[in-house]
């Protein structure tokens, strides 16, 4: 019997079957990478889909600002159009001359606390005319944005950010990139649940269309079709369902907040929109005004945005199937992002722009990381910002539908950060400490600031100088900022620093991408058009 047992025993598993998954410096499975555009019909549809996704934040942020000032719907529409117009221009600049990644540049939540503090500043309370008060506030935000933009411009174009990010390893990038997505969870289900009857169907349909149906369909063409256009399919179906509920009187006797969240004719955007209007600089009744406190506070928000953008750019490069972004290219992109903030200030957009996290997640859903798609999306932004009536139709998509999209997009960006762990040695106690401690503190510190602000209506740092309060409270309320800065500090200062540690940190994998010339693929993905790299070389 013992002999029979030996004879029937399974042969030992081959050693190669037990090997870990191979490390990939480029993400495979992307149908169209950074430099390979889809056919034009698909490119146009995919570009329109990116435009739809970025509209959510473009509408939500001006709506929040206007609600605190009691301004007219016409002013809200004017803000939305301006922000959309500037976002389109900034996206084109970024794709042609900045990082050259398929990154949509849209409204940033990083600046909202600071802009809100300007909106609520006591110096505007003496202005009795609501319209004049609104215009004066907008001019104050303009002045703060114009000066704060030079932080990005100087840090980026001087090469300072290049020198900083050369010390960034895969290990320290994990919390930074992960929390660029996961850290925005407040914009997900909590906002979806404001109208659960349309938010929940949207997220269910989106997951079915993007994850289940492609695997059930026969043939690669059908599978890719649902991957690429899951957002359009699900949004159209649920938007139509919400419209039927609206005209059927489902929300006629509900609370005003429910109507704002659920109705498809909310907020008077369509009726207040002009047919044609071209946004222009200095449009708020006079020149920008400058306040030292507002400027310092806005610069703090700008620095937070700079750090968060770095994490999102890394995620975008991953989902575009490009090589890790060289520090010189990243610094160049930060400089152009600063130029975009300057445009926001000059045009009076009411908020600054940054790389869009939700559109970075959409790259993963569609598995299309083409630069041309994003350039087409920028064209849609500019076009619909001028043709206000048509743009307002799409801007009236209920916020819970947008929040349902965020649940998937932010998850993908966060997962892109976690995927960088493949370059690190998780059996190292040094790695475990840096990852665990930075992630925990990235959750715990902002939560303390949030709870304190919720209970006391002001942050833990409270002095007579509001600008100083914002300089401290705003950065430590950002999960990506806290976890990213902490991981970067620990990773660069914590001993030992030997060859084994470099391998544990993942530096051996990213070493050849620290210099632009070290890998031929950097030239393919990140070189400037029109032979401009000859005159503006990357190092």
UniProtKB/Swiss-Prot annotation:
Kindly provide the name given to this protein in its UniProt entry.
Nucleobase-ascorbate transporter 8
Using the UniProt annotation, give all residue ranges assigned to the region (Disordered). 1-20
Topology relative to the lipid bilayer, per the entry, is: Multi-pass membrane protein
Q: Where in the cell is it found?
A: Cell membrane
Under Gene Ontology molecular function, one entry of this record is: transmembrane transporter activity
What tissue expression does the UniProt record report for this protein?
Answer: Highly expressed in ovules, endosperm and embryo.
Which GO cellular component terms, listed alphabetically, does the Swiss-Prot or TrEMBL entry include? plasma membrane; plasmodesma
Residues annotated as transmembrane: 44-64, 79-99, 101-121, 141-161, 167-187, 189-209, 229-249, 295-315, 368-388, 399-421, 433-453, 470-490
**Keywords, in A-Z order:** Cell membrane, Membrane, Transmembrane, Transmembrane helix, Transport
Q: Which family does it belong to?
A: Belongs to the nucleobase:cation symporter-2 (NCS2) (TC 2.A.40) family.
- Main subcellular location: membrane
| Organism encoding this protein | Arabidopsis thaliana (Mouse-ear cress)
Could you tell me which Pfam families the record lists for this protein?
Xan_ur_permease
